[in-house]
């Protein structure tokens, strides 16, 4: 039994990459509906792939002794078609369904139109996927961050971390809930702390660009609350102190860390509050 790939995961991955590199929007194509059980249909696909490859400056077509035609063996034609298709994929093309194309076009439209083009303005002059390596001053632990984007005050007036998040949340409230559940404040706080320490610049703004991979396939640009980021920085430094203790004691506990000191890993268990609801009265009438 093989689990099928989930289309929403592919869309999420593509959307994330395309907002980092908008040219990818132009590399998603819907293949023509040609009968692949006939030589004419296979030849039509060969012409289609050749037209795509002809647009690529880095592609050098192989010198051929013979041009594909109906005179070729059918299996040889199909192998030739498959090689061309794979070459397109190697050059960055993705082939998708008509429905998926409509979704991607919606994301593309929102990318360019949202807030009068604010996303492009925020990313003008920004650096993408740059790693920052440093050492925490308090714990002396090595640290590294790799934000999706960052921009500086000379370009946009502030030193900002810019994060992209794809989501299956159907509204902003659900997305905020997911951010808290996944502790995004910790990672965003860590980005600011590490980048500020290494560069000497005060990165104190985080802008998050949300990309929906479910209807209505919308986009939102979110300015993170300073209070939430301060909370995240506190959690980050607290986590570093725990990691330092683990290294010093050469002991990396699991759930036994939840037990009280001296309890030897035995955890006091308590059910959540919602389980304490009173039983509702039930009337069982005797109609005899």
Q: Where on the chain are the PLM-derived regions?
A:
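Polybasic (Lys/Arg-rich)
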Residues: 230-277
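Alpha-helical structural motif
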Residues: 11, 99-103, 187, 232-239
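Mg2+/Mn2+-dependent nuclease catalytic core
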Residues: 123-237
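Glycosyltransferase-associated regions of secretory-pathway enzymes
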Residues: 135-145, 153, 168-169, 257-287
């Amino acid at each position: 039994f093989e689990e099928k790939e989930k289309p929403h995961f592919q869309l999420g991955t593509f959307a994330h990459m395309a907002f980092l590199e908008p040219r990818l929007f132009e590399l998603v194509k819907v293949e023509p509906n040609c009968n692949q059980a006939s030589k004419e249909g296979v030849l039509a696909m060969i012409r289609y792939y050749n037209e795509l490859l002809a647009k690529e400056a880095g592609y050098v077509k192989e010198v051929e002794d013979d041009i594909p035609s109906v005179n070729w063996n059918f299996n040889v034609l199909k192998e030739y078609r498959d090689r061309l298709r794979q070459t397109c994929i190697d050059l960055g093309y993705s082939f998708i369904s008509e429905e998926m194309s409509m979704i991607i076009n919606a994301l593309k439209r929102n990318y360019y139109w949202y807030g009068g083009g604010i996303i492009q303005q925020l990313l003008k002059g920004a650096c993408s996927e740059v790693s920052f390596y440093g050492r925490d001053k308090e714990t002396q632990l090595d640290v590294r961050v790799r934000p999706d984007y960052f921009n500086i005050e000379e370009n946009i007036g502030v030193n900002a971390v810019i994060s992209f998040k794809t989501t299956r949340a159907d509204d902003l409230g659900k997305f905020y809930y997911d951010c808290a559940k996944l502790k995004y404040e910790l990672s965003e706080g860590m980005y600011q702390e590490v980048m500020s320490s290494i560069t000497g610049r005060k990165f104190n703004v985080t802008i998050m660009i949300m990309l929906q991979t479910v209807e209505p396939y919308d986009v939102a640009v979110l300015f993170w609350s300073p209070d939430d980021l301060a909370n995240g920085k506190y959690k980050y430094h607290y986590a570093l102190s725990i990691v330092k203790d683990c290294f010093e004691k050469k002991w990396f506990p699991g759930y036994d860390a939840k037990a009280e000191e001296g309890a030897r890993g035995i955890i006091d268990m308590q059910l959540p509050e919602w389980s304490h609801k009173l039983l509702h009265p039930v009337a069982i009438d005797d109609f005899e």
